[in-house]
Amino acid sequence: MAPPPPSADVPLAERLQRLASTLQFAWFSGHALLLLCVFRYAFSWIRFNYYSGMARFCYRFAFIAAAATYGIVVYKTWRARQKTGVKTSGIKDYLRDENIQYLVLALVWLFMPQYPLALLPYGIYSVFHVATYVRANLIPTLVPPQRINAPAGASPNAKPQYTQHPASEAIGVFVKKYYDSSMSMVARLEIMLWLRLILSVILFQRRSWILFAIYTTFLRTRFSQSIHVQNAFALLEARIDNLIGAQGTPPQARQVWDNVKTAARQFYAVTDLNKYESGVAAPKKSS
């Protein structure tokens, strides 16, 4: 059950102090700092000055903030499991946790060469996290909602209703309207980043192979969990099919694309852990 909104009888300074003393406020602060770093880095990037001292600081600190915010969520989840006595079935449960995935990836980006595209998914997530926190926590703290008098004949045990600030309503409309499309955008950005890493491998850029392997593992996990990632890959495949199927396309190009799709499906089948968990064992080699 959600706690009641702050009371207007409590002084504003005390309400803000209570809000700032929570772990959730630290989570919100991390996302807010991440957004500030992304905007500042984008300003440097637009000016082709993304290797300046400030740009490098904002890039690295953005991933520090991302790791901190996702680390807080992972910690709170772990603590909740400890309190309720819920046990995980092994490391696979942790690896399937989306927050752990993004936590690990943030730490990877932190110590790897700059890939500006890597900031955007975290930035988009932070927009919605910050908006949701402002709507649910910050605005009610600054402007406590008024309780709505229950209509005549209402049950005395009915849940009390409160007025909602217009800004909170506007944020709620924004989140509801743009959340799904933004998650689809995140999926497309993550695929674009994967293609960028493939180019890095082809060009033999520093640490590209290990980064490509880690990110491919991440994206494979996201594919099995996110309908948005699945739809983004399906859209990419359809567009390339349409391009390759055009009249005048060399047969060699079509053959290469068919081989790529076959290899991708084989990779998906080999890395599908669900079939091993359901009792379908991997084939054994004959001695």
From Swiss-Prot:
The chain crosses the membrane at residues 19-39, 54-74, 104-124, 184-204. Residues 1-18, 75-103, 205-287 are cytoplasmic. GO terms for cellular component: endoplasmic reticulum; nuclear membrane; nuclear pore. It is a multi-pass membrane protein. It is found in: Nucleus membrane; Nucleus, Nuclear pore complex. Pfam families: TMEM33_Pom33. Its main location: nucleus. Residues 40-53, 125-183 are perinuclear space. One of its GO terms (biological process) is protein transport. Signal peptide: none annotated. Keywords: Membrane, mRNA transport, Nuclear pore complex, Nucleus, Protein transport, Translocation, Transmembrane, Transmembrane helix, Transport. The nuclear pore complex (NPC) constitutes the exclusive means of nucleocytoplasmic transport. NPCs allow the passive diffusion of ions and small molecules and the active, nuclear transport receptor-mediated bidirectional transport of macromolecules such as proteins, RNAs, ribonucleoparticles (RNPs), and ribosomal subunits across the nuclear envelope. Belongs to the PER33/POM33 family. Contributes to proper distribution and/or efficient assembly of nuclear pores. This is Nucleoporin POM33. It comes from Chaetomium thermophilum (strain DSM 1495 / CBS 144.50 / IMI 039719).
